[in-house]
Amino acid sequence: MQGVMKVNKTHKILVTALTTCMLMVSGAFGTVADAAKKPVVAEGLQGISVKGSTDLPGHFFLSFAFSRNLIMLDGKGNIVWSKHEAEPKPGGHTGWWDFKKHKVKGKTYYSYHDQTGAYDNYGLLGYAPGERVILDEHFKEVKRITFEASGVTAKGAPLDGHDFLLIDLDHYILSGYLHDKVYNIPGYAQGSKVVYSYLQEVDHGKVVWDWKSIDYPELYGYTITEGDPRSNDFANQKTDAPDYVHFNAMRLDESGNLVCSFRHLNSILCLDRSKRKDQIVWKLSGRGDEFGLAENEKSSCQHYVTVDGGYLTLFDNNNRDKQTRITSYAVNTADKKAEVARFYYIPGKYSQACGSVQHLPGDLYVIGWGWAVNDNECMSVYNFATGKKLMSVTLDNPKNITYRCVYYE
């Protein structure tokens, strides 16, 4: 399934050097003129304030890392659907993650991840064991999904909440974090306990493909500590659960390969779904980068990736420099060449975890700020072509951080 991400000739015009493509926007984005609008929210729902609006015909989907809130906004910023539930255990951080829309054979479904609080999270704040909840077009629950039985998981084992791909109602790709002792880390012959990434594709109840990060010992050497100083503690001195890759996003490319983001590798990996072994097709960014990126072009603790035509677009948290960036790479996978095509940042904006970005027509960018450090803005819509911020959503309680804020038509 190896293929080339061809750069669209029309878009190629936009590809410039990093220094000219960078848009520093202190002062470039005017304040949104409208007075803050206070949407009517259901009792107990996370409070938000909206400034500005867009003409987008679809909806914004907001999910929260540490609370059980889901919010859908229209393009004007009005709440059109919401859901709230008290935490089963106060202070338990049992959030609803990754609220999204799916179109399958002409039918609309929605889904979110329910961190139920019933499973062990290995002491990791960034691991949310639970179940994927599927809703029909009327938001009625259709089914709940957990892992199927495989060589490493029991049927009903919890999923991780970072991402989920619905191919059909009975065909999907799942993600999870598993805890085990391994003996293939160079220099640790006595064995090390680790938390590793496990991906499982299920078609009508049958596991048709899976992937385990521990099958690729070279990845241990690529682990970075910018997001978690314990992530490479293979001696298990401070933790018996080093989260050494930290999977957080996946997309299918045009060849059917799975393009995945791994925060603690600072890297994007492409996985071949037609293979059981030697499944890694290529690595972009991080210590294992195969595309010749300069150090300042590499991502740092990125949380989101999209396959955007001929580009890979990242929400680069950039824990290294504490200045979050939006970066798009034009990638030629056949020749292992990549260049920075678009690069934006807003001075002072830093998200230490979570977050998302989508590039829409007209050079609009929908940005979910995740765990924003220095303000309570959780979502922005920017037109980088004109230097305008069209819409801004802020949290009444800034501690109740969003997981993702994404747009669907």
Language model segments and positions:
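Sec-dependent signal peptide cleavage junction
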Residues: 24-38
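Histidine-/acidic-rich catalytic cores in large beta-rich domains
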Residues: 36-409
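Bacterial N-terminal signal peptides that target proteins for export
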Residues: 6-18
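Short intrinsically disordered, low-complexity coil segments enriched in acidic
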Residues: 1-2, 72
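Short intrinsically disordered terminal tails
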Residues: 2-3, 35
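Intrinsically disordered, low-complexity peptide-like regions
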Residues: 6-9, 32, 77
